Amino acid sequence: MLTKIFPVATLLIVFLSSSVYAQDEAAKIDKSRVPAQADSPEKFAPAGWKIEAQISGDLNGDRVPDYALKLVEAKPEKDADGDPTERGRALVIALANNNRLTRAGVADNLLQCTRCGGAFYGVVETPAEVTIEKGVIVVQQDHGSREVTNATYRFRYEPSTGQFLLIGFDLSNTDRATAQVTSESINYLTGAREEMRSKGEKDIKARSVIPRRKIYLDDISADDMESAAYKRLKL
C-alpha cells in the first residue's frame, strides 16, 4: 500500500511546487484582453492587471491629452518575507478623441518586470520609467550587477499607420568596477549610429550608418534589442 502512496504523494508535491513557481513568475499580458476603446484609462487594464503609472500628453498632434499607461500585474507587491514579488509589466497607449479613448498600441515585451533588475537593485523593486517628451514616448530602464545596462527607447506616432514607431534607441554598458563605459545611439529615422567607448579619461567615438527599418511599439522586444546591441558592441 505504501508503494502506491509514495508515487502519488511525489506527484502532488511536484504539482504544488510547479503551481507556486508559476505564480511567482512574471506574467505576460494577453493583448486580446485589452479593450479597443474605453471611456477611462482604468478600463484598459484587463482582469489581473492594474495601472502602475498614468502619463498624459499630446501624442498625435491634435492638442488633446493622450495616455501612456504603465500596467503591472495585480499581485501582492511583497512576499511573506517583505521582499518585492516578481510582477510583469506592459505599456498601453490610448489616444483621446470625442470623449473616448482608443487603444493605439500595446507593448508586451518592452518593460522589464519588477524583479528583473538583477543584483544592481537587490531586493528593491526594479523601475521602468515611462515619460512623454514633446509628443514622444520615452522608455528608460536599467539592470545588471557589476556591469549595468541602461537602455532608452523613443517612439513617435506615425499618422499613415496609426502606430507608434521606434525613432531612437540608446544603450550603454557600464563596468562599475573599472568605470569603463561602452555605448551606442541609433536614429532609426536616418539610420545614423554613434558608438562610444571610454578608455581612461579619453572617449573614443565612431560613426556609421545602419540599414533603416521600421520597428513598432507593438512588436518590439527589449531582450532582442539589447542582444543585437551587445553583438554590435562586441560585449
Task: Kindly label every feature range from the protein language model.
Residues 23-47, 99-122, 216:
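Blade-edge motifs of beta-propeller repeat domains
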